[in-house]
Design a protein with these regions (language model features):
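Acidic (Asp/Glu-rich), glycine- and aromatic
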Residues: 1-17, 111-113
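Conserved functional micro-motifs across diverse proteins
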Residues: 11-15, 19-24, 32
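Beta-strand-rich recognition/accessory modules
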Residues: 24-113
Length: 113
């Protein structure tokens, strides 16, 4: 799993990685096996506003998926278990009565050669 920002584990709010099967790199997260226990990483952005995007490639299935948001995010969480991985891009909303705001999320699913 790749992110468009530097990942700094020392800035995470919470880390749950009981089997140590999730490995954190500078801009990517890799797995050294299939986690049988739940894992969770809170606040991958370290509280800094970043471009909201991620890309996940399954090498065995030769398929990729990515998400890009039209907003800035200051919080990205990552949760997973067994064959599930769930990146969460948070969008902080503050609007007054009568105001409106718009944002979008685009997902792309593709084959990998």
């Amino acid at each position: 799993m790749k992110f468009p920002f530097q990942i700094k584990p020392e800035l995470f709010d919470k880390v749950v990685n009981p089997e140590g099967k999730v490995e954190i790199g500078q801009k990517e997260i890799k797995f050294n096996g299939s986690p049988k226990e739940q894992f969770f990483f809170s606040n991958l952005t370290g509280g800094k506003y970043r471009n909201p995007a991620w890309e996940l490639i399954n090498i065995e299935s030769k398929i990729g998926i990515s998400e890009i948001g039209s907003f800035k995010t200051n919080k990205v969480n990552l949760w997973g278990w067994k064959h599930v991985i769930c990146p969460e891009l948070f969008f902080k909303i503050f609007i007054k009565p009568g105001q409106s705001i718009e944002w979008s999320r685009n997902y792309n699913i593709y084959k990998v050669k």
